[in-house]
Each structure stands twice: as C-alpha cells, then as structure tokens.
Curated annotation (Swiss-Prot):
Encoding gene, per UniProt annotation: dapA
One GO cellular component term: cytosol
Organism this protein belongs to: Oenococcus oeni (strain ATCC BAA-331 / PSU-1)
Annotated InterPro entries: Aldolase_TIM, DapA, DapA-like, Schiff_base-form_aldolases_AS
Function: Catalyzes the condensation of (S)-aspartate-beta-semialdehyde [(S)-ASA] and pyruvate to 4-hydroxy-tetrahydrodipicolinate (HTPA).
Listed name of the protein: 4-hydroxy-tetrahydrodipicolinate synthase
Primary location recorded for the protein, binned into one broad class: cytoplasm
Annotated catalysed reactions: L-aspartate 4-semialdehyde + pyruvate = (2S,4S)-4-hydroxy-2,3,4,5-tetrahydrodipicolinate + H2O + H(+)
Pathway(s) it belongs to: Amino-acid biosynthesis; L-lysine biosynthesis via DAP pathway; (S)-tetrahydrodipicolinate from L-aspartate: step 3/4
Amino acid sequence: MTNLLENTNLLTAIITPFDKNNRIDFQVYRRLIDSQISDGVKGFVISGTTGEAPTLSHDEKIELFKRTVDFVSGRAKVIVGTGSNNTKETIEFTKEAGRINGIDAALIVTPYYNKPDQAGMIAHFSTIADESPLPIVIYNIPGRSISALTVESLLKLADHPNIIAVKQCNSDYDMSELIEHAPKDFLVYTGEDGQSFLNYALGGAGTISVASHFYAKEFADMFSAIDNGDFKKAAGDFRFINPRVKALFSYPSPAPVKAVFKRSGIDVGIPRLPILPLDKAQTDGIMQVLKL
C-alpha cells in the first residue's frame, strides 16, 4: 500500500508567529508558508514543539489548522499536532481536526508526565489509531516526554493500518533498527536535524526539521544528492548544515528561530512564556554561526 507521505522527505516543524498583542499573526504566517514551499519544503507539522503547542489554546489550534490548509492550498502535506497525555482527549481533538478538509495526518506525541510503560503506550496509540479519521504519525521524543517507545513497541504499532510513520527523536541505533525492520509502508522520519544525513542515507523517509526555516534549499540539495548516489556532495551539504543546527538549538526552542527571523527583517514575535526571547548578545552569537 502506498503511504500518503511517500516522497515527502522534508517537512518543516513550523513556528507560530505572534503579533505585538501576543496573538497569532496570520499575515506573517502565510508569508512563511509561501517562502518555505518556494524553497522546496514538501510538508508542514503544525502545532508541534516548535509551534509552541503547549501555549496555544484549543481554539487557537483549530484556527491555525484551518488557516494552514487554506494557505497551503494543496501545495504541501499538512500534519497537525493533536496529541496529549490523555488518550480520550486526544481522540476527541483528533476527530475534531479530522473534520477540517485538507489535513493529511495527525502527529501524536508519546504520553508525558504520567509515564506509562510500553504496554500502556501501545494501548494509547492503538486506541487513538482505531478511532482517528486521520492517519497517525507517532512522535517519539523522550527528551521532552520522558516516555520512550522502544524499537520493539514501534514495530508492533507499525503494523496498525492507520499508523503510517514515526517522527523519531532518539538514538542513531534505534533509528537504524527501525529503518531496517519496519514494514515498507511505514515511514521513519527523524525529528533531529543533526540526524538528517544519516536517516536518509540509511533509507529513512527524511527529516521533520527546524533548521529548514532557513536552510530548506540545502536540505533539499542534500536529499537530492543522496537520491542520485552522490554521497560526497550530500556529506558536504550536511557539513554546512550541521553547525548551524547546533546554533539554532543553543537556547530553548523556538527562541533562536524567532530571534533570527526578527534580525533578518521578518518580525514573528517572541515566544510565549515560559520560553524567554533571546537578548542581543545571544542573537549576535547565533548570527555569527548562521551567516545569513
């Protein structure tokens, strides 16, 4: 069976811009989406970590989903973050999102804070997938959620017909094992920009990226080089990207991305608390590395 995300190797985990009144700035948001698509991005993850999902209200998320579909207008895939550590609420919210025409899939994070075991997480994702009108992309990010799905658990979930991919933010070894053993129609993405070369070179699906806000063309060139068997060029592209990735994650995300946009002439506002904006010295340090 063909996966609807097949050949979607670069997705941006897009920021949520805010205006001076701390409301979502949809005019700037539309500009970002158009620019990203022009630069080669093939999809977007909305209301994820980089999109400041924890500080967005339910109504803000729904409006953001609707506006995204309108702005994208079929030019790229749209994946929306609907997950939480409450299975019932996740099902209800995913169903609500599923009533918006143009959304391709839902990103569901591993349950945080309540720390279920592997059996509990398998039950969580299976129950959501059974009820969801949208295909599910698992978001396995133990660095933020504490709970980590093992390779064995992910392979069990990969057999569910409504679970189509994983955004894997874990070790190189786990990612490699998933790529090796997952069904062919189950896609293994990395959510770590620093794993982008390794993931794609090993046969993974690509990257759900933060650095692609500024380096989408470089990511696209790297993936194209790998597709063409030119690993020397791809490695060079990655060596260019990698130190810039480190700089963009030198402070809590998405504060660096927002600071760089503002310094570059696009005011996307500041993060909502508890993430603080960067000061001038912090931004200067990042800009010296990025050289935009």
